[in-house]
Amino acid sequence: MISSTVAAPSHGTRNYVIVTLAYWGFTLTDGALRMLVLLHFFRLGYSPFTLAFLFLLYEAAGIAANLVGGWLATRFGIARMLAVGLSTQIAGFLMLSAVSPGWGATLSVAWVVVAQGVCGVAKDLTKTASKSAIKLTAGDASGRLFKWVAFFTGSKNAMKGGGFFLGG
């Protein structure tokens, strides 16, 4: 039972916390994923150019997802887009876990590039949905919105760095 002197957290605050925690989990694993892929192929002796190529589709797919992400969120809802983004990241992880040491170099690199593309779509769908959800959660309180977005953005970057360390 909540006492009358302590206010219950608002529905908007609860949604903000849920979205932020989901995005933190996503960002932590995304940073770790990038480091694991990079270090794995570096250890196998791949050139810097090939290592950069591994992330080409990741970034290109992210651009495409950004272009349609807002429209998808409007059409299907922000919560659904957040769930789709998180699910797509899991699909990308499962694809990466299927890489076999017995595969040839060309097949391994091609498979990882496609899996990275899936993760690039996931990244931008999740980011678009998360930032949109935060803006809707704050309602008309623009000062509070600014603080929430600043915290969300800063914490996102900190989690990404944590993911790099986790993956390294």
Task: Please place each PLM-identified region on the residue numbering.
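C-terminal ends and interior cores of transmembrane alpha-helices
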Residues: 87-105
